[in-house]
A protein has these predicted regions:
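Short alpha-helical transmembrane segments in multi-pass integral membrane proteins
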Residues: 1-14, 72-137, 181-237, 293-358, ...
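Residue-level signal for short hydrophobic patches within transmembrane helices
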Residues: 3, 7-26, 30, 53-60, ...
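Transmembrane helical elements of multi-pass membrane transporters/channels
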Residues: 12-31, 133, 167, 196-200, ...
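Hydrophobic alpha-helical transmembrane segments in multi-pass membrane proteins
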Residues: 13, 17-25, 62, 94-103, ...
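Helix-terminus/linker motif at the lipid-water interface of multi-pass membrane proteins
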Residues: 26-45, 114-121, 177-184, 244-277, ...
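Small-residue-rich hydrophobic transmembrane alpha-helices
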Residues: 44-104, 141-160, 267-325, 329-331, ...
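Hydrophobic transmembrane alpha-helices of multi-pass small-molecule transporters
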Residues: 56-59, 171-175, 201-205, 277-280, ...
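Short runs within selected transmembrane alpha-helices of multi-pass transporters and secretion channels
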Residues: 65, 134-152, 160-168, 189-204, ...
Length: 455
């Protein structure tokens, strides 16, 4: 990460990460496809109505895993083995605790939260059942994500991908067996998701236990070290809050979609899942930017940091443009994978028509905060993202949307919020970058040799 051609290493790092994200999203996609094709639009709406709400609950802790990733990358690059080991064991312990807490919270408050979102009576019982079963698997979900974050910090993106391939195949097979064979509908797809997440969790923990070096996991050493937890929180909590608040605005958006009825909910579910594949593709580049920036920042290579950001911008815009245009032109064909009902497909196409082509803006919007988090600056990007993304969407939902009630007009809030956030994040990055340069006399001063992987 700290030497050699940047673009080649970015691609080799980000591509397995992209595939991992796509496979993880496939858990939800297979759920949606199976219930949409074999259980009908109401079951599809029931599963889809929980997506934004689930993200509101869990993304705080997933965001904190970014803090573990940044801290571990920094210690690994600097060859600080004891600090690396403490970070690993603190992160895994935190994952276990947060997973158990989220399981209890999700099971207890699922129905009440869905009622607050205005979930229609004809789907709320199935939505509640799906959400409660899904949350029972939170400990497995958290442990996998934190374990994978540690592996990514040391440059290993291939093994998490392999683990997801295995668990994804299990998930798909169980979905077909439980829904088609046993007619369990939404309960069946939720159970399949839990089992597959358990498999990926076991595989990543086994990998960490069997590895040699500073990031080896020992269950006997699992504990919370307050000093390292504080450092993880410094980067992770702002990232988690940002993601949680953004998904809260998406939950408000889901509530607005709910007002159009089950058909619109099903169309949004299919379209939103498709947009999710676009997001994980550009987000993998953001995560690569964060990891590369963190390692180069830790060894004082500030000029190389600039090149990392520029190459990430080129890569992100290119990927988003190709995928976004493909989704725009072939949206109807893709949506038929999720459902055969023409009205549902029409609603999905209405949403895709305004969100897919400008999706490159979303990739740009996330890159600058990713670079800043890699440098250890997380609070200000979080505040700016909340103001730009959440503020704009809430303003749109409560002020502009009532003037013209249509799905197309509602989802103009997406590109509008992306553009507003980009402007603020670019200005923030400029001033933080200037502050970093002023702190050193020679930005390209070579420090002692890095221990970073891929050097």
């Amino acid at each position: 990460m700290c030497n050699g051609t940047i673009m080649d290493k970015l691609i080799s790092f980000a591509f397995p990460l992209m595939l991992s994200g796509i496979l993880q999203l496939m858990f939800n996609a297979v759920d949606i496809i199976v219930v949409g094709r074999f259980s009908g639009s109401q079951a599809l709406a029931a599963v889809g109505s929980t997506t934004a709400l689930i993200k509101v609950f869990v993304n705080l802790f997933i965001g904190i895993s970014l803090g573990a990733n940044v801290l571990a990358a920094r210690f690994y690059a600097a060859g600080r083995e004891e600090e690396m080991s403490q970070t690993v064991h603190t992160a895994i312990t935190l994952a276990l605790i947060s997973g158990v807490v989220m399981a209890f919270v999700g099971v207890l408050f699922a129905k009440g939260a869905l009622e607050l979102m205005g979930t229609p009576d004809d789907v709320i019982s199935q939505s509640t059942l799906y959400m409660r079963i899904y949350f029972m698997g939170m400990p497995f979900f958290m442990l996998y994500n934190y374990g994978a974050a540690i592996l990514r910090a040391v440059g290993d993106t291939k093994r998490p991908l392999f683990f997801l391939i295995i668990s994804g195949c299990i998930n798909a097979g169980l979905n077909l067996i439980l829904v088609i064979g046993f007619h369990l509908d939404v309960a069946g797809v939720a159970i399949a998701t839990i089992i597959s997440q358990c498999v990926s969790c076991i595989l990543v923990l086994r990998c960490l236990c069997r590895t040699q070096g500073s990031y080896q996991l020992h269950f006997s050493k699992l504990s919370i070290n307050g000093a390292y937890l504080k450092q993880i929180f410094q980067v992770g909590i702002p990232a988690g809050i940002q993601s949680t608040v953004i998904n809260f605005s998406n939950a408000l958006l889901q509530s607005s979609v709910n007002s159009f009825g089950a058909t619109a909910m099903a169309g949004y579910t299919a379209a939103n899942n498709l947009l999710g594949f676009l997001y994980v593709s550009v987000n993998s580049i953001t995560q690569a930017c964060m990891s590369f920036t963190s390692q180069n920042f830790s060894v004082g290579k500030y000029k190389r940091m600039d090149r990392v950001l520029m190459d990430c911008l080129i890569l992100s815009v290119s990927v988003a443009a190709v995928l976004g245009c493909s989704a725009y032109f072939f949206g109807a064909q893709i949506l038929t994978i999720y459902t055969k009902e023409p009205d549902v497909i029409a609603c999905g196409l209405e949403i895709l028509s305004i969100t897919t082509v400008p999706y490159f803006l979303c990739g740009i919007m996330d890159l600058f905060p990713g670079a800043l988090r890699g440098m250890g600056y997380s609070s200000v990007p979080m505040i700016l993202s909340v103001i730009g993304t959440v503020g704009m969407r809430i303003l749109w939902i409560f002020v502009f949307f009532p003037l013209h009630r249509s799905l197309y007009f509602l989802f103009i809030s997406y590109p509008a919020s992306w553009l507003a956030t980009i402007i603020m994040q670019v200005i923030c990055y400029y001033f933080v970058r200037k502050k970093c340069l002023s702190a050193v006399k020679n930005p390209d001063l070579e420090k002692k040799k890095s221990h970073a992987i891929m050097c």
